[in-house]
């Protein structure tokens, strides 16, 4: 154990004499000694330098230094027992989990258990003291110390529900470590100087007359005395610490300066964004007409130019601070007051839930990201600033940050809605005009062609974007991944893209709508790819060109004149599609020969594409299939239900409204018949022979006599005709 005096270093052997003399009320010198509270408290670390060194080593990137810091904390734990600070213990547990995860050797299940135990202990330890005497919700206690609700929800899932995914555990670990670093470890370094001042003021109040002399004595005892080595192991350990003291102090200073610099730059970035908003809304109030204000925004004022220049400087120093400020509520994520001022009606894309038409928690799967874009007035509001900051590095970092935030957000709400919209908007805006832009939907293409958020698109690192999207899975990941594939073009083969989409859809449990091919019709009966109907729809496009001819031949054989006339009409409707396909092929060949006219030809094709009407509508095809199924079941006890049932909510083998009674699916009216009363078939009238079953039992059918040579080869019972007749008389068929 060591004696720690505020922020000063630890005392040596003679310094410990002062401790014991103060403990027993004795005085080493002739002067009156200081009380115990004036000197400090007994701690587990040797000196302030060791504490600072462990602080730096815990949060560095070197695994060896992190293990050394964990070993020092283990020593502290053995010295102090249960008196080790809770923040230190929680930090050590989380760092140890992180090291085991990075170094490998453990499976996913083991890592989830380790992360889960560390996170549960963290939440329990910070709330244990306040929940002993009064029942206070954990979320209320967490909000008091700036811990988000999703950490408490993660702890609840780890304790009471299904174990969350390993990525959620990692995300929680990284957040808690960052919270501990900012809230506890950095504050210990900031408060060291203040503790020294308080200790000196306390000494001045006790000994006013001999202030200078006592101060010199204490300084001499602290600085000149050194701990005496007791054994070789301890001396080696002290040498290692002494060598790392100077290096640790420098790293601590640089780390604290970096943290303070990030905070200052973040506050400065927020101030600049607020100034920008004030200037933009001033223009809106001046014109009091949104179209005129938008025209004025296109010509930035000198104040906006000044804000943009300063914000570029802050971005060069610390880009992360600017991104943090941009994604705060009130900036790229608007408030309801800002939307009302811009005459924008808030919609989160989940109209089904908002209108009360459905309460299924999976209704977000019905959201089509092809129609999700930032409202034009709001994007034009931020266009001057985003256009000025637009670069490959900044836009790439902004997109990756928004993708990483989506899993932690909810399904509905203004924040997830606008982060999702900005993500799609930036991807579409940075797609170069050409074959890639042709793949977007009509709404996205219109937004891309009608006005441009940026003067020119940046060459983003699309494979890295794919990794970011897959690394932060959420309900919208399959559709976002599809949009990224459209933007990157032929960066990945189509087969690889389809595999990634299927894996992502299965992982996020959103495989119902996400795997429908572009330009193809969805299955009208349950949109799952694992039914016979989906197999029929997947095979239909390949044979659609021959479908009309096959139908015509069948109808000619039947001699139906009316059906032939209807088929001729359908063939006339199909012909324009074939002509359009040939024209598109000719246009593609001309594009390869002349690349200068590529954009105009693609725009023409994008405008013509949505108006093709050659394919049969899903409603008519659905009615035709239902008619076929009803005809096949006509006369039976089963019928095709016309109700819209969500079969994905029912287990396999269960029906809507079915109870636990096994006899519920039995038919009300049915006839029974004995086995001997069933109709006699011609096969039964044929002369029977001796047959041997798979168990080696030979039986006689008809006369009941078997040859001795065949029966002698097998062992077992011989069933006689009378015994078989007795068995048949007791069986009933229904």
Swiss-Prot record:
Top-level taxon of origin: Eukaryota
Cross-link named Glycyl lysine isopeptide (Lys-Gly) (interchain with G-Cter in SUMO2), sites: 215, 226
Composition-biased stretches (Polar residues): 547-561
Annotated stretches, region: Interaction with NOL9: 636-655
The entry's keywords: Cytoplasm, Disease variant, Hydrolase, Intellectual disability, Isopeptide bond, Nucleus, Obesity, Phosphoprotein, rRNA processing, Ubl conjugation
Role this protein plays: Required for the synthesis of the 60S ribosomal subunit and maturation of the 28S rRNA. Functions as a component of the Five Friends of Methylated CHTOP (5FMC) complex; the 5FMC complex is recruited to ZNF148 by methylated CHTOP, leading to desumoylation of ZNF148 and subsequent transactivation of ZNF148 target genes. Required for the efficient pre-rRNA processing at both ends of internal transcribed spacer 2 (ITS2).
Subunit structure: Component of some MLL1/MLL complex, at least composed of the core components KMT2A/MLL1, ASH2L, HCFC1/HCF1, WDR5 and RBBP5, as well as the facultative components BACC1, CHD8, E2F6, HSP70, INO80C, KANSL1, LAS1L, MAX, MCRS1, MGA, KAT8/MOF, PELP1, PHF20, PRP31, RING2, RUVB1/TIP49A, RUVB2/TIP49B, SENP3, TAF1, TAF4, TAF6, TAF7, TAF9 and TEX10. Component of the 5FMC complex, at least composed of PELP1, LAS1L, TEX10, WDR18 and SENP3; the complex interacts with methylated CHTOP and ZNF148. Interacts with NOL9 to form an ITS2 pre-rRNA endonuclease-kinase complex.
Protein name (record): Ribosomal biogenesis protein LAS1L
Species for this entry: Homo sapiens
Gene: LAS1L
């Amino acid at each position: 154990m060591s004696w720690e005096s505020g922020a000063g270093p630890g005392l040596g052997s003679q310094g410990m004499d002062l401790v014991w003399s103060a403990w027993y009320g004795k005085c080493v010198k002739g002067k009156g000694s200081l009380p115990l509270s004036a000197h400090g408290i007994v701690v587990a670390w040797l000196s302030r330098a060791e504490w600072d060194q462990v602080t730096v080593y815990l949060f560095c990137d070197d695994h060896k230094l992190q293990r050394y810091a964990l070993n020092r904390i283990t020593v502290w734990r053995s010295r102090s027992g249960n008196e080790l600070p809770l923040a230190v213990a929680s930090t050590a547990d989380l760092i140890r989990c992180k090291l085991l995860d990075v170094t490998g050797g453990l499976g996913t299940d083991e890592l989830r258990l380790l992360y889960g135990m560390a996170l549960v202990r963290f939440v329990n330890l910070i709330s244990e003291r306040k929940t002993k005497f009064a029942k206070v919700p954990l979320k209320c206690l967490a909000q008091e110390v700036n811990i988000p609700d999703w950490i408490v929800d993660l702890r609840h899932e780890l304790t009471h529900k299904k174990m969350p995914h390993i990525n959620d555990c990692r995300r929680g670990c990284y957040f808690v470590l960052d919270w501990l670093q900012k809230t506890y470890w950095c504050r210990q370094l900031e408060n060291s100087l203040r503790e020294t001042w308080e200790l000196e003021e306390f000494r001045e109040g006790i000994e006013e007359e001999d202030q200078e002399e006592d101060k010199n004595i204490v300084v001499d005892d602290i600085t000149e005395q050194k701990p005496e080595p007791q054994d070789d192991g301890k001396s080696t350990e002290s040498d290692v610490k002494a060598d790392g003291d100077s290096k640790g102090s420098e790293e601590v200073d640089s780390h604290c300066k970096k943290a303070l610099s990030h905070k200052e730059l973040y506050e400065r970035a927020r101030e600049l964004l607020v100034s920008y908003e004030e200037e933009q809304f001033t223009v809106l109030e001046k014109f009091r007409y949104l179209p005129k204000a938008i025209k004025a925004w296109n010509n930035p004022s000198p104040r906006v130019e000044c804000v943009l220049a300063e914000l570029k400087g802050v971005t060069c120093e610390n880009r992360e601070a600017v991104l943090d400020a941009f994604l705060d509520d009130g900036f790229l994520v608007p408030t309801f007051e800002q939307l009302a001022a811009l005459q924008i009606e808030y919609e989160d894309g989940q109209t089904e839930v908002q209108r009360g038409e459905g309460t299924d928690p999976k209704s977000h799967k019905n959201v089509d990201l092809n129609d999700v874009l930032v409202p034009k007035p709001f994007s034009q509001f931020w266009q001057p600033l985003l256009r000025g900051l637009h670069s490959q590095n900044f836009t790439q970092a902004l997109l990756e940050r928004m993708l990483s935030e989506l899993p932690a957000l909810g399904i509905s709400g203004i924040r997830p809605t606008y982060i999702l919209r900005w993500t799609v908007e930036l991807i579409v805006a940075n797609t170069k005009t050409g074959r890639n832009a042709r793949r977007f939907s009509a709404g996205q293409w219109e937004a891309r062609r009608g006005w441009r958020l940026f003067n020119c698109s940046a060459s983003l690192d699309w494979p890295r974007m794919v990794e970011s999207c897959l690394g932060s899975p959420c309900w919208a990941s399959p559709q976002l991944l599809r949009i990224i594939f459209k933007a990157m073009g032929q960066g990945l083969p189509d087969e690889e893209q389809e595999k990634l989409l299927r894996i992502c859809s299965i992982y996020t449990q959103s495989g119902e709508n996400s795997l429908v091919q572009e330009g193809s019709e969805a299955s009208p009966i349950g949109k799952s790819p694992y039914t016979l109907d989906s197999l029929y729809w997947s095979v239909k496009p390949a044979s659609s060109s021959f479908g009309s001819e096959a139908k015509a031949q069948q109808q000619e054989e039947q001699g139906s004149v009316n059906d032939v006339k209807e088929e001729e009409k359908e063939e006339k409707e199909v012909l324009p599609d074939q002509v359009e396909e040939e024209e598109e092929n000719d246009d593609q060949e001309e594009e390869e020969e002349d690349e200068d006219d590529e954009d105009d030809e693609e725009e023409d094709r994008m405008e013509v594409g949505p108006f093709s009407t050659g394919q049969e509508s899903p409603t008519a095809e659905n009615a035709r299939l239902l008619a076929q199924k009803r005809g096949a079941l006509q006369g039976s006890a089963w019928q095709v239900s016309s109700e819209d049932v969500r079969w994905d909510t029912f287990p396999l083998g269960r029906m809507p409204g079915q109870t636990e009674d096994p006899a519920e699916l039995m038919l009300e009216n049915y006839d029974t018949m004995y086995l001997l009363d069933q109709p006699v078939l011609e096969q039964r009238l044929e002369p029977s022979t001796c047959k041997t079953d798979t168990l080696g039992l030979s039986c006689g059918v008809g006369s009941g006599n078997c040859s001795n040579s065949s029966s002698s080869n097998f062992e077992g019972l011989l069933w006689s005709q009378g015994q078989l007749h007795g068995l048949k008389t007791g069986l009933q068929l229904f």
